[in-house]
Amino acid sequence: MNGIYFSGTGNTKYCTEALAQATGGSAVSMESREALEVLRASDEIALGYPIYFSDIPRIVKAFITEHAAMFRGKRVFIIATMGLFSGDGAGLASRLLRKCGAAVTGGLHLRMPDCIADVKLLKKTPEENRALIAAAQKKIAQAANAIKRGIYPKDGLSFLHRIAGLFGQRLWFKMHAKKLCERLKIRTE
C-alpha cells in the first residue's frame, strides 16, 4: 500500500513509510509534487498525519478538501501519530474522507516522542522515547501483517473514540492552546 503523509517532526513520516514498506508500497509527503500522482494512481492508500492539540492539522484538512474528487472511490487507511492520546485521531480524517466518497478501511494510532517541551505531561526521558518508538515499530509490524490478511485495525473510528476525543481532549486542548498563544511573547529587538 502506498502512503501520503504530513509530518512536522519526522514521526509520521517514519511511521507511514514503515507501514507502506511492510505492505509492499512506498510513501511520499503530501507537500511533494509526487503526492497527487500517488493519490491518482493508487486504489488504496495510507494517509498519515500527526495529532495537534487533539485535532487534525490544517494542512491535512486542506489537502483532503482541495482534492476531494481524487479521494472518491479510494480505499484509505489512516495513520495518526500522537504524543499521548487522541481518542478519535483517525476518525477526524475519516469523517472528512467519507464526505468525499472515500471508503475508510481502518485506522492506526501510534504514540511517538512529542515535540512540545513546555507541557510536563509530554516530556519524556530518552529511554522513554526509545520505548515509545519500539512499541510503535511493533504495532506497525502487527498492523501490516493483519492488513496483508485483509484485517484492518480500527483505532479511533468508533463513536466511543469520538466522544473520548471531543470531551476527553479536544475541548480542553483548544482552551489550553489559546492560553499558550496568549502567553507567547516575541521580541523584535
Model-identified regions with their sequence ranges:
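FMN-binding flavodoxin-like domain, especially the glycine-rich phosphate-binding loop
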Residues: M1-G3, S7-Y14, A20-E34, A41-Y49, ...
